[in-house]
Amino acid sequence: MTTTQKLQKRLNDSKAMRWTALIIVSFTMMMAYFFTDVMGPLEAPLTTKGKIVYFDNGTYMSADALMNVCPSIASEGDIAVGNTYCTEIIGEDGNTATESLTVSSTINGLGWSNGDYGIFSGAYGYINVFLLMLFFGGLILDKMGVRFTGVMSTALMFVGAAIKWYAVDNGFSGEMFGLPTQVVIACLGFAIYGMGCEIAGITVTKVIAKWFTGHEMALAMGLQVALARVGTACALFFALPIAQSAGTVSAPVMFGASALCIGLISYIVYCVMDKKLDNSIANQETAGESEEQFKFSDLKVIFCNKGFWLITFLCLIFYAAVFPFLKFATNLMIIKYGVTPDLAGMIPGLLPFGTMLLTPLFGSLYDKMGKGATLMIIGSVLLTIVHVLFAMPLLNVWWFAVIVMILLGITFSLVPSAMWPSVPKIIPMKQLGSAYAIIFYIQNIGLSMVPVLIGNVIAANTNDGTTDYTMPMSIFALFGAIAVVISVLLKIVDKKQGYGLEKSNIE
C-alpha cells in the first residue's frame, strides 16, 4: 500500500470529520470565554456598597445616594421595582427641575474597592504565573495527549467556577491577607478556573493543529477564536441583564458555571473522535504518535528559537493591551462617553462580534496568500491608534466610541489570525504543546499584572466618582507601540531564518 493510500485513511482527511471536531472543541472554549468575562459588566454593582438601583431611563445610583435625594425613603428595603421617585436636579442654566425616576431593577452590591476589583481581575493568571502550572500543563499535554489534558483542564474550569460562584453568592465577614474574605475566595476560584482555562486553550490549539495541518489551519484557528469571542460578547451583553433580573451578582456567575459543565461534556464527546483519529493512523509515523514521545531535552528546540520568543513577547504585549482593557471598558463608556449603564456593555460587545467575522476572513487569507508577519505588523499599528484615540480628550460621544471599538475589532482579528497559525511553522509538532504553554504562561504574566496596574491607575485618577481615563489609555497605547516594534523584528527574523510566515499554509 502506498503512502498516499495510507494518508487517505486518516480521519482528518475527511472534511466533515475535522470540521465537526473543530465545532465541538470550539464550543467548549466559547463557554470558557463567557465565564472569563462574565464579571466585566458588573463592575458597578461589585464596587457599590449596599443596593444599587437602576432606573427606566438607563441611569443608576446607589441606594444611599437615592435616599439622600429622596428623604421619604426610610431604608433600602423600601426601594422596590416599579416605584417612582421624584428628585430635584439643577440644569445648566442654574434652574431647578423635578425629574421622575422609575425603578426598573436592583442589584445587591458587594462593596469591593476598585483595587479589590483589579486584584480579582488579575487572579485569573495567579496560579499559572506564580506556580508555573501552565508550563507544567504544556508538559502534561505533550506527554499525556489531548484527551487526558483536555478533560483535566475543563474539569478544573468547572471547579474554579463553582468556588467563584460560592464566594459572590455568600456574604463573608473579616479579612484575609489584608483583603476582604469574599475577594480572597473569589480570587481563589478565578485562579483555579484560569489555570484550567489556559491549559484548555493550549490543548484546543494543539487539537486544531493535529486535525488541520496541511489543510485550512489558519481558517480553523480563526473560527475557533471567533466562536470564543461569541462567548465574550454574550458575557458583555447579557451578564448585567441576568444580574438585574435576579437582583444579585451571583446569578450570571452561576449561569456561566452551568455553561462550563456543558462544555466539559462536549469535550468528553470530542475525546471519542480523537481516539478514532489515533486509531486511523495507528500504523503510520504520525503527529498523533509523536505527542506521546516528548522528552525534556526537546525544550532546547523551543528556548533557542528567536522567532518563537518574538511571537511570545508579541502575544504578551498585544493581549495585555486588549483583555485588561475590556475589563474596564464598560465604565469607560459610561464615564467618558456618557453611555447609559444598560447600553454601556454593548459597545465593548461589538469587539467580539467583529472578530467573529473578520478573524476567519483574515485566517483564510493567510491560508491562501500568506503574509502572516505583515498582518501582525498592520494589526499592531492599528492597536496603537485605537488606544491613542481612546486616550485623547476629544469627541466624548457614543458614536465615536463605537467607531474606535470597531477599529479595535479589526485589530483583534488581524494579529491572532496570523500569530497562532505561525507557531507550528516555527516549532515542530512534538514540542507544540510545550511551546503554546510557554506562550500562554508569559501571556498570563501580562493578564495578571496589567489589570492590577490599571486598577490602581484608575483609582489614582478618580475624584468624586469621576475618572480621568487619559493615563490608563496611554499605558495601553504604549503597549501597542511596543507590539509594532516586535512584529517588525519578527518579519526581519523570518526573512533570515526562513520560517515561512509570509508563505501560504495550503500548498
For the regions a protein language model found, what residue spans apply to each?
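Cytoplasmic helix-loop-helix junction between adjacent transmembrane helices
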Residues: 183, 189-227
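Juxtamembrane intracellular "pre-TM" segments in multi-pass secondary transporters
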Residues: 2-14, 278-311, 507
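C-terminal ends and interior cores of transmembrane alpha-helices
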Residues: 155-178, 381-395
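Extracytoplasmic gate region of multi-pass secondary transporters
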Residues: 39-44, 305-359, 416, 450-451
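Symmetry-related core transmembrane helices of the 12-TM Major Facilitator Superfamily/SLC fold
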Residues: 251-270, 471-489
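C-terminal transmembrane helical hairpin of 12-TM major facilitator-type secondary transporters
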Residues: 372-419
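Cytoplasmic membrane-interface "Motif A"-like loop-to-helix N-cap segments
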Residues: 142-154, 367-381
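Central cavity-lining transmembrane alpha-helices of secondary-active solute carriers
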Residues: 122-139, 349-362
